[in-house]
Structures are given as C-alpha cells and as structure tokens.
Amino acid sequence: MADGNLLGSSTSLTALLPTPSSASLSASLSSSSLPVSPFLAPAPTTAITASIASLSAQPPPPLPATPATMAGWIGWVFSFFFQFIPSVLYSVITFTTITLPTWLFTLFSMSLTFTMNFTTLLLILLAVVSTLGWFVRYRFLNMYSRLPPEPQRKEPQIDLFPDVQGGDSKPGLANYLDEFLSAIKVFGYLERPVFHELTRTMQTRKLIAGETLMLEEEKGFCLVVDGLVQIFVKSTRDGKSGSDDELHHLGAESSDEEHHIDGKQGYQLLTEVKNGASMSSLFSILSLFTEDIQVWDSQSSTSSSSSIAMRAARVPDSTPNSPRGGMDSPTPIFRDVPDPVSLVNENGDLPLVPPLHLEESPIPPTNHAHDRRQHDHRKHHGRKHRKSVHPDIVARAMVDTTIAIIPASAFRRLTRVYPRATAHIVQVILTRLQRVTFATAHSYLGLSNEVLGIEKQMTKFTTYDLPNNMRGTALDRLKDKFIKERDRLGTEEVTKGIALHNPSAGRRRRSSSFMRKDAVLHAKMMSPKRAATVITSDNSYDHDSAGVSPGDLLSTIQQSRFGPRYEQPTPRLRSPLAEKENSHFRLPAMQARNAFHRKESLDEDALFRECILDCIMKAIGLTSSTGEVLRKSSHSGEASPKLLSYDSRRQKAVFSNNAFGFIDPYEGSGDGETESMMSMSVTSAGGTSPVTSLREELRNDIEIVYFPQGSVLVEQGERHPGLYYVIDGFLDVGMPVVDKGEDLVGVSKPATAREPFPTLKRTTTASSIKPSATAANDPRRRKQSRKSLYLIKPGGIQGYVGAVASYRSYTDVVAKTDVYVGFLPRASLERIAERYPIALLTLAKRLTSLLPRLLLHIDFALEWVQVNAGQVIYHQGDESDAIYLVLNGRLRSVLESADNKLTVIGEYGQGESVGELEVMTESTRPATLHAIRDTELAKFPRSLFNSLAQEHPGITIQVSKLIAQRMRDLVERPVTEKGAERSSAGGVQTATSTLNLRTVGILPVTAGVPVVEFGNRLLHALHQIGVVNGVTSLNQSAILNHLGRHAFSKMGKLKLAQYLADLEEKYGMVLYIADTNVNSPWTQTCITQADCILLVGLAESSPSIGEYERFLLGMKTTARKELVLLHSERYCPPGLTRRWLKNRVWINGGHHHIQMAFRLTAEPSHPETKRFGTVLKQRVQVLQAEIQKYTSRRIRQTPLYSAQTPFKGDFHRLARRLCGRAVGLVLGGGGARGIAHVGVIKALEEAGIPVDIIGGTSIGSFIGALYARDADVVPMYGRAKKFAGRMGSMWRFALDLTYPTISYTTGHEFNRGIFKTFGDSQIEDFWLEFYCNTTNISKSRQEYHSSGYVWRYVRASMSLAGLIPPICDEGSMLLDGGYIDNLTVDHMKGLGADVIFAVDVGSIDDNTPQGYGDSLSGFWVAFNRWNPFSSCPNPPTLSEIQARLAYVSSIDNLERAKITPGCLYMRPPIDAYGTLEFGKFDEIYQVGYKFGKQFLEKLKNEGSLPLPEETEEEKKLLRTMAPRRASI
C-alpha cells in the first residue's frame, strides 16, 4: 500500500512539479530503497523503475501556446531549448548510469538450480544438435536449391513473313515492263546502251487462245509478256526430223500421251510458259549470238595427217545447228593463198541486203566466179541447216497471249557493235547453261554420257600437233632433262609433277596499272604515226608485214585498260582481195618457221613454250576466226564508211566498246582510264609497239610439266586449274564409279570433294570416314573405282570447256603413261577471255553445235527462276507442278500444324532439290517452301518429267532412287519425332540447318566490334580447315574496287547480284563482313546474301540490343542467326551468356565463345613508358603478371591446349561448325565405369583431335560437362577425381539414407557433390557446346538440355531410379537419360557433327539361356544360388528384371548408333568394374587412357583418323599451280 501511495505521489508530483525536481525526487526514492531486504527489494525496485521509465517515456511538458508576435516566437524557442532538451539528456544519463547497472547487478547476483535425469538431458542435447543440424543443412548446405530460377531457353519462333509477291499472273499489260525485265534477266547485267540496242527492234505479237506458233520458224528471242503458252516438242517416235539421227542417245521411243497439233501426231508437252518467262532456251540465245562465229579454223593445217583427218570428221548430222557449209568434202588448202571467201561464208553468209543497211553484211566483192558459186552453194547449204534456233519446237497459246520477239538481227548487230558486252552476256549464259542444264542433266538426271560426250567431241576442234622440228630429237632432249631430275628426286617426290625451270618466270607480269599507263602513253605518242600508216599504200603495208610472225602481230595492238592485244589491225582503205593477199594469219608451219627464225638465239625450252602457246591459241579460236570477223567489219565499213564512222563515235561517247576494230581509222585512241568497263579499242597496223604484248606475257606463263604414270592432274568436282596441252604421252579422262551398294543412295548422299559439282548435297555429314589422300592415289584402288571415258593423245588439249568457261570438272584426269604437258594457268585464260571476246564466242558456237537433242529439250523446259528473300515459292496444300533445284541461295521448308505452329522440316542449299515426291505421286505440297535469301532456282516442270519418263525411263529410275532414299530417311526419323525432340530439347539446331552453308554474314552487335579482324581470323581458319573449292571474304572496299562507284546504286544492283552469284559458285564459302555503318547499302547486302549471320559482340560490354541488331530485325530476314561472344581471356563468368541471350529471341542457331585478343583503347602504360623509360615498363609488366597469377580466378590454359594443337583453336572450331565438319564426342552412362571417359578424352587430346560438340548421358554428362566447361583435360581430371572421392565415401551414403518410399537416399549428398563441382554455372557459359539427355517420366519421352543450370540437368541425367529421387523441372520428373538412349549419336548427328567419337561404358547384361520351366519357386532360386554343384544358371532377380525392362529401348538405340555413318564406336574393357566403384578412380582411368591410345593409333594406321593435316591434304586439288621447280 505504501508502494502504491509512493507511486501515486510520485505521479502526482510529476504532474505538478517541473522536470528537474521530479527527477531528483525519483532519484532519492530509488536511493533510499537500496538497503531494503533482498527478498523485498525486487518489488519496489521494479515499481520505481517503472515510474522512472514512465517519466522518461512521457512526452515533454506542454509548450506554451504559439505566440503571435516575434518576441513571443523567440521566447517559445528559448523555453523549448531550456526545458525539453535537458530533460531528454538527463533521462538517458540516468538510465545508463543507474538503471542498467542495477539490472546487471541483480541478474548476476541471482542463483538458479535445475535438477533433471540423464534421459532428459540427452533428449535436450539431441534437440539442440538436431536444430543446429537442420539449420546448417537447410540454410547453408542447401544453397543449390535457392538459386534464382533460370528456365530453359525456348526454341525461337520461326519467322515466316507474309508473301508480298503478287504471284505468277499480273493483270493486263500494266506491268509490261516488269514482265519484260524479269524475262531478260537471263542476259545478266546490261548497260543502258546495250539494253537499248537489244530492244529497239523488238516486236510484239498477239496470239488468240488455241493459236499455234511454229518456233522453228522464229529466228529470235521469244518471251511471254501476258498470257500462258504451252511448249511442245516433236517426239522421236516419228524419226523424220532432219536432226533426229541421235536416236542412240534417246532410249525408248514409245509415247502414250501425245498431243495433236495441226492434225499431226507425235508432239509432247515440254513446259508451260507464264508471264515474264522466256520461250527460248539458253542454247537458242547462244545460237543467236554466235551465228557469225566459225566452229574451227579452216585455214590451219598441222603437220600431222591424223589431226587433219580428225578435224575432217565433222559434227554429226544429229546436232540441230551443225554448220556444214562445204565441209562434207574438205579440199586441200594452199598454204600461201588462203581463200577469204570461204572463210567469210563457211558458216553461211547473211542474206543480201542493200549496201547501206547496218544490220547485215553484203557479199564481199570477188573476182573469182568459182568462189562465188562455191559461196552460193555454201550459203544455201548453211541456210538449210541454220533455219532455226528452236528445232522441233511448237508453241500453243492456252489463253489470249501477248509475246515479244527480239529478232536475230538485233543479236547480230549487238555482236558487231558491242562485242565486249556480247562476250559478257555469253559468259553469263554459259555459266547458267552449266549450272542449270549441264549440272541438272549430269548430277540429277544421271545423263553423264550426254554431258561428257560434249567434252569428248570438243577434242576434234582443239587438236593441233607440234611442228615436226619440235619432235624427235628435240623432244628426246626434253625428256632427258626430266628423267635426270626424276632420278635425283626419287619417285615419292614427283607425284605432283616436275616443272621445267622457266628463267623468265621471275619477270612475268608487271602490275596492271603500270601497263595501262604505259599503253596510254604509247597510244598518245604513236597516234600520228598510226594515222599515217593506215593511209599508206599497199607496198608499205607489205613491207611492214613481211616476215611477220604471230608474236610480232601481237605487239602491234594497243594495250589499253581492257584492250585486246591479239587481234589483227584493221586497214580500212583496202580491198578484200589485197587484204587476202597480205593476211597476217599465216599457217602454223609458216608461223613456226618465222618464230624459230626470230628466236634462233633462244634455247629449245623457250621454243617449246612458244609452239605450245601457238597451238593453244589456235585451239581456243584466236586465229582465222578473228581475221574473218575483222574482214566482215571491213566490208561493212567499205559499204557505208560515213555511217560506220558516225556510229563508232556515237558508241564511243555513250558506251565505248570495240573488240574487233569497229572504229573509224582516223579516230584517235582515247585515254584508257576514261573508257567504260566494257570498252576496248584497237590500234591500226604499222610498226611494232614497245608495250609488252599478250603473247610475250603468256609465253612466260606456259609451264612444261612432267607427270609420272598414275598422277592425278584434275579431280572430279575441282575447278579446272588451266589448260593442259599434251606434248607426249596419254591422258586418261574418266569418272569414279559408285559401288553397287551405294548406288541406291548415291544421289542423295552428300558429295565429297571428289564428287561432281554441284551435286544434290555438297557438304557432308555422312561421308566422315573417307580414305586418306594417299589411298585416293593408290593405282589399284583407282582401277577398281574408276571408269575410263576417252584418251587425250599428243596434240590434244584437256580442260578447254572447263577452263575457258570456268566450269567445274565432271571427270578426273589421270596420266595414262608418263606424260609431258604444257600448262597454261586459268588466270592467264581469264585474261585472254577478258581481252578477246572471240574466245568465248568460239566456245559458245562449238557448244551449240555439239549439244545433243535430249539436252536441248531439257534446256528448253528448264526455267531459271529468281526469288527474293522471304518470298514463298509454294504454300502447303498447293498443287505440285515442278521440282525445284537450288542453283544459288537457300530455301526452307516449313510445316504448319493445325494450331498454327510452324515446324522446320529442312533447309536446302546450293545443289539440292525439293519436290520430287509430290511430282511423282501427283500429290499436294506437304509444306510451305520459302526463300531464306535471294535465291536462283532451276524449275523442272512436271510436264518435262512426264515427257522424259516416257522416252527415257532411266531418268525416272534415277529420280526414284532419290525419292526412295528420302522415304527411308523419313521412316527412320519422322518429321513429327524431330519436331517433338527439338521442342523438348531446348536446342534450336536442326539436322539440315548446318548443312551446305555457302554464305556467312559477319555483323557486329554495335559499333566498335572488331569484325574485320574477326573475319580475317575466321578466313584464315577456314583456309587451314580446307573448305571444298576454297573460301573468300568480301568487305565494302573489295566490292567497290571490283564494281566501281555504281556498286550499290540502282543501276549496279543486278551487276552486283551477278558478281556475288559468280563468287558463290566459284568458292565453297563466301564471308560477307559488314564493316560499314548501320544504314549503308553494304550492310544490307551482307544481311540479304547470308545463309547464316554471325552476330559478333564483346562479352565484357553491355548486353543491350545494338543498332545493327535493330537494323537486322527491320530487314525481316529469315536466315539462321548465331551469336558470337568475344572474350579477352579464355573464361566466361557464370550467367554472362544468359544475359546476352535473354532478350535475343531471334538467335536461332546457337552461340559461340571465342577468345580473341583485342584492344579498343590504348594501353594505359604507354604514357608512363615515354616519361619513365623502358625499365619501368618492364617492371610493371612483370609485377602485373605475377599479381594476376595469384589473384585471378580465371583458369589459365596450359600450352598443351593452345600451342601444340593449333587446330583446336576457337576459330577453327567455329570454322568446322560452319562447314558442317564438326567433331562430336558422345559419352555414355555406366556409373563408376564412366571414369574411363577421362582417360579417353586425354588420349584424344594427345592425338591432336579437336572436339567441337559434347553430349553425355548419366556419368557421361558429368564428365562431358567438365570438359566442355574449360575445354581442357587438366581441370577436368582434378574435378572428376574429387567427385569420385565424395561418391566413394560410404559415410556420406549412409548419412543420406531415408525411408525408401521413392528412393533409398534423399539425394542431398549427391546434389552437393555435383553442385560443389559446377557451382552456379550454366550450360550456355561452357566454352564448348554441350547437351545432356534425360528421361521425362511425367510425359514419357526423352529430353535434351542445352541451357539452364548445369548441376540440375547433370544431376537429372544421373538420377538412377530407386537410388536417387527424380528431379523436378517445370512440373515434370526427370530421370537418367540412359533409360531411353544411353549413347545419343543420333542427336549429335542432328547438331551437324561430321565425325562422332562414341564411348560406351554401359553394363552388359547376362544373356545366358534360361530353362527353369513354366513356373518358378523362390525357395529353389535361393537354394540354387548357394548350390555350387548346380548346373542351372541363376535366374535374374526382381530388381534385375526391372532394370532390364527399363533399358529395353536404350539397347535398340545403341545398336543403331553403332552403324551410324561417321560414328567411331569405342568400348573400353571396363566390364570388370561395378556401377558404384568410384574408389577405383586411378585404375579405371588408366584402362580408358590405354584403350584410347590403342584405338586412335589403330585408326591412324588405317588412314581413317580425321586429323586436320590429312583433311588439308585431300583439298590440295591444284596439282600444278605450285609444282616443284627443278633447275634443269
């Protein structure tokens, strides 16, 4: 009560008194209570303390009311500071100095006593320990379960942009110009004056529905502007055509579906021509351009009668356009006086026209009536056989149709006025003829005999023997030189041939710019003298030409920028007869005599080279053909000199182009630098030029090479290295023969480097194990796998068609005997073709005269189609009307499901075909086909297929083989299975997406990325890997240097497209490097031309979207896109890649980690270096290196990886991925037996075999992830051994046991072991591409994981049912992937791996036959196990039966993997070790290492080890471009 009164009094006092007095009172009360008894003290102390606390906790005393005046404000502030703040300070001091010590004294003076028994104490101790254990277990040791969620990256959605193209038919004539331009795109790039010249005489014609047009009677280029026309061909069943003698080429002649046209039977439908398509074929265009070109040189006679007989064997009558004017009975030609009239009219002259008509040439005046009669006869005979460029072809309009016709006269005039442009067009058409018609017939339809027969018949035009005095003793002396050198070198050193030493080789060619300037200077200095020479009398001309050899002739030609230097000067004011008498085009023997007389002081080697060059030049048409065209031009000039002069001035002002001398003789030669790209000019005769002539230049290029018997000069599929002129010996031209077993799938198999180009698939993933280059050169093997076609005898030329027209060889050429050849490189031939269009025109004329009827009709029906990027070629469900062959570009086939989900079925690159199955079965299109980029296609219409099937069943069989192979692939791996597999795997690669990539665009993410250096290093790596047909890179400067300032203008767009298409056809791969700013046309070109786009970014920079990526998205390209991250060190921080990929859903081709040393800013130590000297710089660098050695957490690479194995570099890995030649490593599961994987990988490292992709199952996924993380065997070994030690601990296993509801263990220790190994790393951060597989028991399917946390999916792949619980992933339960597929070779093949090393360490089941009867007693089984005398095998236990049942599907996949092409199956001898014997790490590791060494050594001895060095040797196709020189 007293306490209560005291408390109440204190409270009342507090309310009445000021703060200090109340505080003193409470202090006195508390001090007076100290001597109280200890038993009574706590109560009053507590009460007083409460009062003190209440006093201190109470708010300060109420302040006076807020004053209204300034003095009141000041007083209020003073009262606040002097009352409130001191009271708070006093309360704090009192609590810390009095109250708190009192509490502590009371607490420590208190004594407590607890009494309990041992059981209670033990229970409390267990509770405390369990609580601490739970806290540590679930708070500290369970960090792996608290990682932030990182779901797998989903497959990007396929971009299929709406088709903006209008389709085939456009209404009316509104788009007349568009249709016309699309039709004449076949001519390639046309400059404006050429276009006007070609189209100014164009005519249009209206055809009503059902009207028939006899194309046989149409001499011109026909195209459909509006409407629909059907093209028919006369069936060979009639056999009455004048050009139907080649029935042996055409097979069966029966025709069930024939059409009636004008009451006649025997016509078959070839194709239907729609808007903007040509009714003429490539062959007919060549015929129009080359009407005035001679097929062979009628003046040239060789010293060999056999050659004369060979040339007398004329073109067979079956050829549609065989020029036969007076050639059935060749008459001897006098050496001294060649007949110019026969030269002019041998192919039939043009019809007689008035003299002033510019488009036709009149008959040249002649004084010999016999010549005139002979001319008339030949003219009539030639006209009869040249009446049509469309033999046996009839067109019928299905609807009212408008067609446009460019008459033949326009082409003849174009050839005269613009010969350079004509040669350019002919070059384009020759290229397309090879890529469209020849490649389709040879590689797709199997018409090898027809195609190769053209090259065989071409030898009759190109055989010219050496003069007699260069044979016999001179040839023997030449052979002796080579024999001595061969004996000195040995047989092994001469497989590539021995080249005769050329003393002039060192001074071969000056730079082109120097020669241009020299030529221009000389032209200006010599122009008055040239003019005087032109108008001199015949005597002076005779004097100048007396004793002139062809070499002297060449020296008289001006060498302008693109000028000719091997064409006859054109004396304008001379009669044809006088010109005939003073012709410079002598016969070979006289040429040789003059040459020898002029070169008496030189040795025989130079004479050999000169004679070989003479023969080669005559063979390619640089002889009388040139003179004949010059004479025709002079005739035209004589008939209308003023008009010709005016016309030449007009064309010089607009489009200067003169190859054959169509220029006014008084016109001075302009500056070579100012001429057009197509321009040329010719000087007149008179004097010799000091400028180095083409002849002198080429004579230094001629190599005389010796090849021993069996040497390979040209391989099939190789671009011709040049011309081989056979001096002595025989060359065998043949082709490889596919084995019987491979014949069924030979068409659809990807081609190797030795297969023809282009084939259906040039880049391979199935031809991994190929014999080495030495095996390929084995004569015994060659005899077994090679079919000989024909021989090339001395005097013959090999590679004429291929080298001049830049074709690829359909055959291989082998030395039948020891052979001596003259070799002219392809580069020299290209210079000839550039300066002398007559060479190309002669080749075109010869080709058209030899084309078989079957190829002619195929050429008519094949349509060359140009498709823009993103354009849909056909939609799913459309009627199938054609087969499409990819000439250039890339297509993608997309399947659209009912829920509008798009699935990629396949991608088709250059040389591949699509649509055969639907055409043959006449079904609808199963999927939508669209162009990934700008694409050129050959459209093979169904009507042509039906027509060929009736007359040539072999073609049907060939296509049926292809369809059978594709159906087999479809059965073995259905489309739906692939789609489900990819969607569940999280990966985005498809089986076809990495195949046959021809163009790669290199695009920076943002400005500042060193893409040029990256591109150069990638180019170097591709060169070292050995890409088929080579690789090149393009940047803006390279394009500008080649095409000039109009490269990116509207005018040059077609020119650029054609140039890029030619490059892509010439090289196996083209790199487009976007080294310009974002909005430049070159960046746009790089994007639109790329099959695959590499987005290059700096890993350490910001992962935000860059400006180049925004531009890329705006382009709406559907090309494959891959991300390349450049690292300065060989280390990727965890989570870095995920940040880059998170916002880039358009990356649909994976990513790559590349180490590349780069520096965007200058080193900070450079300024100090200048001020403090080199000593300080060295000290700083040493200290920095030492500090980084101990402080950096990044794993340093040992020299084992980088220095000794250069092919394992990052750029080489990227190069192999792009080429489709990646090396995959598949590691199977098997528990502790998987430790052998470590030894096998070490053996692969020591053998120098690079690994690009790693896939694993169970323990294989663990070992594979360790290797993929760092791409080094050293850290992999240490971490694997540490993990094996944890797994071998029985204490950890025992502590992890739990009640076996789902599994025997909780899985915690297992999780921690894996997590301690990998940490929070993600699969995307691995240096090598990695995946692992699991079994999803929730959805009953297999899944592949290539993104997300490593430890989770490796743990899931290692989860053995019953021992470890399944891991949960997005609601599904994942178990060991080995239950479905323990060796994932099939998926690795789908990722683009060419060679796969598959290591199987799984257990082998006991397959002992059982015979325990129809019922079984468990007691008997138990007794039988312990009975040592029992002869009955022990039946499997219940757990064994369940385990075998779980692995049923895995066994089937394992057997399929063993026979997969390109798979090297390895099984180390580890059957003696159990699944959980992790304690035997060193022992199992040594077993795997020794087995790997022995296995790889065996492969190396067999020649089937895919070492980079051997692969490089296989690609060295140019046998003579770098021959071994011998100074003989």
From Swiss-Prot:
UniProt-annotated catalytic positions: 1258 (nucleophile), 1376 (proton acceptor)
Keywords, alphabetical: Endoplasmic reticulum, Hydrolase, Lipid degradation, Lipid metabolism, Membrane, Repeat, Transmembrane, Transmembrane helix
Limits of the PNPLA domain: 1225-1389
Record topology, Lumenal segments: 94-115
Residue numbers spanned by region Disordered: 238-260, 300-331, 360-388, 761-785, 1507-1528
Catalytic activity field: a 1-acyl-sn-glycero-3-phosphocholine + H2O = sn-glycerol 3-phosphocholine + a fatty acid + H(+)
Membrane topology: Multi-pass membrane protein
Segments traversing the membrane: 73-93, 116-136
Cited function: Intracellular phospholipase B that catalyzes the double deacylation of phosphatidylcholine (PC) to glycerophosphocholine (GroPCho). Plays an important role in membrane lipid homeostasis. Responsible for the rapid PC turnover in response to inositol, elevated temperatures, or when choline is present in the growth medium.
Protein name (database record): Lysophospholipase nte1
Organism: Aspergillus clavatus (strain ATCC 1007 / CBS 513.65 / DSM 816 / NCTC 3887 / NRRL 1 / QM 1276 / 107)
Gene behind the chain: nte1
